[in-house]
Structures are given as structure tokens and as C-alpha cells.
Amino acid sequence: MYIVGIDIAKRKHEAAVIDGEGTVIIKPFSFTNNCSGYNRLLAMLAKAKLPLDEVSFAMEATGHYWLALFTRLQKEGFRVQVINPVQTNSIRSFYIRQAKTDPRDALLIAEVIRFGHFSESTLHPENIYELRELCRGRHAIVSMQADVKRKVVALLDQVFPEYETAFTNMFSDTSMAILQTCPTPKELSEMPLGDLCHLIEVSSRKRFRMAKAQELQELARNSFGFAMAGDVFSTMIRLYAKHLDFLKQQVREMDRKIAEIMETLDTPITTITGIGPTLGAYILSEIGDISRFSSAAKLAAYAGIDPTMRQSGEYNGVRNRMSKRGSPYLRHAIWLAASSAVLHDPALKLYFQKKRDEGKPYMASVGHACRKMVSIIYAVMRDNKAYTPYIPNEISA
């Protein structure tokens, strides 16, 4: 057996080859992350006269840079193993000189495979991979929305602090129409009342009319906001409001694409209380093949909601926190699902209340509910059966 350890980088990879005894067969060499580099990799193996059916390739899951080489090797029939960088670091700690260089890392990656104590990262099926990219992209855009909203609020707090009292939701369609047209007290108070009333009536679908227009102009005339740099504040608020509209359209487009993929999967995950199509997509795309996990505890560790253990001698930690070492996207989705389920699912609601009655804070109680939610998700995905809520006679701790 020959192991090709590859240290992945953006433009240039480093590779080295060892045999089953750990003897270096090919010293570390570099090759570019393109077709000519790939050909150089194969040429180096051919030069060493290595039988390709006895060669195994190993690489770290470094960002997204490993995907192109991984898929090319797999397509051509090679055995490829992908490991977590944490596992390479654990091997490095055994060496007295814990140097980190690309050539040395290529050898370390090969050694990890030779020792056999590793868990492989896998490339999900294409539809799951597409779903994951969409969900992560959606998460990024929603984060942008939150950031832009904070900027709008900060500007309005300075120039028009009374504005937030006019709407239950400052970012409703009606409010956004006003922020894109007349966002400052001066512009709002000087706008003809009839024009303002028409704008409000159209944007609110006739929910608001003259009374809301009069209320807004009264607030504008009596505003205690910062009077300087009005043109700049107006420009910034208008631009941010238009940016929010654009981001909102992008989220809708992503949601449509996510829904299309979810329809093809025919999954029972959305039968779980607290998990709708969007959260279900996040969870499915991050987990992938549930058979990768032998237990719900392994899935909890992957999500990073397993408790950290603190033990030394006779000491056992009693205030253990979430490890938060797994997928942040999966952890966030499970947290949202559990937060909803403790309000609507009979068993989780009772379990959550039990933890609250024990004196645990709200967030800690939701954390316990998250671990129960993981068990439910694991069982539903493992058995591929719809979830049936129930109230147990006794709720286990």
C-alpha cells in the first residue's frame, strides 16, 4: 500500500508518498491546483513506478480548496480519503519538533492514514451539496440583512428618533417605502399630505391611510433629531433601504430554489415540531447521510451541542457548557427548532419546563431541549419515518 499525503492550498498543493511501513517513497513536492498540476502529480507516481491500484490519496478538508482535486481523483477511480485538520494537529503533537510547513504537513497527512485512527470527511450527493451551498448562502444574506438593519436604526436614532414609534415593524413594506422616499423629518414634513397618503395607501395595500400620514408628519414636525448633515443622512438611509429590498429579493429567490430541492428529497424531517422547510433544509444539508453517525450523541458532537466534560481526579465539573466545536450552521438551525418546539411540542414543552423548575436559566434549558431535539432528528432520519409527538409518563433527565 502506498499513501499520497496532500497538503491543500488555494493555488499550489504539496504532496509526499509513504508506504505501509512509513518509509518515504517520494519526498515532498509541489504541484499547482490546475490540470497541468494534476498531470504532474500522476507523472511523479509513474516515475516512481508505483502501481496505481495500490495507491491511496489523502488530504485535509481545507476550506473548499480540496473539492476540485478530490472530485477529479474520484472521477478517475482513485481511492481518496479526506480528514479533518484537527486530526493532523493531533499527530503533530506527538513529535518533539512541532514544526508546521506544507511539505511536513503532506507527510503528516499520510501518517494519519497509515495509523488508521481517523474519521473521514465525505462529499455529499450533488443535491445535498447544492442544498448546503444554498442554505449557507442564505445564512450569509440574512446576516447581511441584520447588519444593514442595525445601520438604518443607528442613523434614524440620530436624525429621526421618533420614527420607530410609528410602526410596529420598522422594516415593513410601508415603512420601507417611506424610508426610500422621505427618510428625514425635513423631507417628510415638507412632502404634500396627499402624496404621502397615496404612498402609504399603496405600500400598505390600503391598511394605512390619511391618519398614518398625519401621524408621521406630526412626528416629523416635532422631531428632536440631529438637524445637521440632513442630506447625508437621507442618502445613507435611502441606499440602505434599497439594499434591504435587494437582499429580501435574493432570500426569496434562494427560498424558491431550496423548496425545489426539498420536494425532490421526500424527507420526513419537516414533520418534526419546530422544523419547517427552511430549517429542515439547513439541517438536512449539514447532516447529509445520517448513517455517518452511529448514535444521536455522535450527531450532537458534530453539531457542537454536546457538553464539554471537566474531570480531574475526584473532581467532576457540574457547569458544563456546549462544546460549540461542530457545524455552526447545524447548531444554529437546531437551536431555532428547539426554541420553537418548547412552545408547541408537548414532550419538549414539558421537558423544558422541568429544567426551568430545577432552577436552570432559560438559555440553559433551551440547550437541554436542543439535545432532545437532536435525538428526535436522529431517529426520524435513521428510520425515515414521520415524527409523532407524544407526552411520556416520565421525562428522563
Spans of model-derived segments:
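A detector of single, family-specific signature residues
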Residues: M1-A397
